[in-house]
Amino acid sequence: MIPIIILTPKVIVSINGNDPAFRIATDDCIAICMRTAMYAFLLNLILKIENKKVRNVIISVVVLSQILIQGLAYIGVPEEKRGGPEHSDSSIEVANELLSTFNTNNTELYRYKDINQNLTENYPLVMDCPSISTFLHIVSKEQVLTHSQLGYTRNNTKLGDCGGTLLSDAILGIKYTLSSDEMDNKIYQKDGTSESGINLYEYKNMLPYGIIYENTEDIRTIPEEYNVYETQNYVYKNLFSKNEDMIQEITTQKQKIDNNGDLTKYKYTIRVNEKSYLYMHGNESNSKIYIMRVNGENVTIPWINNQDNTEYPYRYENGIINLGKFENQDVEIEVVCYKEDCNLKFATLPLEKFENFISNYKENTAKEINIENNKIKIKIENAKAGQKLFLPITYDTGWTGVNNGEVQDINRIFNTYISLDLKEGTNEIELTFIPAKMKLGIELSIATLVIILVYTFGIKKLIKKDGILDKIIVNLGFGIYIIITVGFYFKVYLMCIIQTIKQWIGLIE
């Protein structure tokens, strides 16, 4: 009750753009302190009322009034004052429109990608479609780190699906792209445009969902020291038994051309021979770009609250950036950065080589994959001994499986994906996902409920109230509760603070 009363923002009589409910400035802090003293005095008077029923009614009215006023305070606040589209319902309206226009809920396997970040990371939940994007925060450390290592944008544990390359999209089953810009018609096929001006594209050529591969090396993890391009080539070469890199990293030197206080201007000159996409990537720890120009043209790096953003890397946009398609030319890239924080890495993806790879890829097996609720059903015929199936689905100990009626081992690959060993001939596989600790949680909850019922309706009636035995049982139960509660808060909250401080110390050292 007291936290609800004390921590609520001040009552707003008139809602307007200059005084939004979300702002807690100095005057608000003073108002909270004054109101806290007032409520403390008021509660002291209320608690002196001897009539328990009257006392409880008055306290309830006070608390509910504050909750009601708090709710009303958020009505009418302009979108730009409450976090922009990212934290308002406008992005949900756009996602609903896309769902209605493109029937995204009919897509079972292949994933979607919001390349301009017109939506929040949770758009797949609204559009009922597959995607690597998520705002749920319930993701593993391996999933978060691999997401970044492959060059997709990430804001702490919010995973976005913009970034990456044509290669990583193909491997991860990202077939459909939502974009407010026109896409390369040599690579993409346009499927339609929504009323909000967002286009739906799909790759003209695509790898099958799930890759049959042969590899006896230990590829459960990806070397931590690999950059985004090395990571993509590592995955590509190990899945498809290739010796050459698909993505060609470029070694180039930056040239300082201007220095004005905290702002420094650099120029990169990159020679691109065969027709290629030119990619760029930078880390937030050593790069802070304010403006970027490619052959004199400004580069925008959009995100949901600012489609004209030019900062990079930004906490909302820090994945691989596609700078465009070039052939037989020198590409000049000018950047204006903070002081000298400019450590960008460039690479090219030769389009003819990539398209030939996709077009010529063949699997000598018949494969069917169906996903429904928490089950994945897979049928593979004509498999050879030693072959494996790569699934671009997050590995978790909660997965169990059977293959032809026998237990199927589920292996981790590339830090966070699933690999299945296949049997020679026909494989009829069914995978089922149940959160790893869910059964234990249910069992503990039932056991706790049984103990409470036995104590309340059994033991408590047989022992003396407030007697020694009663006090021992109550204090023991309360002690266990405190230990569990403190442990929970330590694990969820305090450990995060400790880890953050350790990271700060590491950066200082």
Residue ranges and their predicted role:
Residues N56-V62, L109-Y112, K175-Y176, I198-L200, ...:
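Beta-sheet entry/capping signal
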Residues M1-P3, P20-A21, A25, A40, ...:
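C-terminal, active-site-flanking charged/polar segments
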Residues P130-G261, K267-R271, Y277-H281, S285, ...:
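A cross-kingdom signal targeting lumenal/periplasmic-facing segments of multi-pass membrane
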Residues V63-E86, S100-A170, L207, I212-Q232, ...:
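Extracytoplasmic/lumenal acceptor-recognition loop(s) of multi-pass membrane glycoenzymes
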Residues Q117-L119, L178-D184, T394-T397:
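Short, polar loop motifs at secondary-structure junctions
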Residues M1-R82, N427-E430, K439-E509:
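Membrane-embedded transmembrane-helix bundle of lipid-linked glycan/lipid transferases
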Residues D28, G83-L99, I508-E509:
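Short extracytoplasmic/periplasmic juxtamembrane "stem" segments immediately C-terminal to an N-terminal membrane anchor
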Residues N243-E509:
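Active-site-proximal, structured, solvent-exposed surfaces of multi-pass membrane proteins
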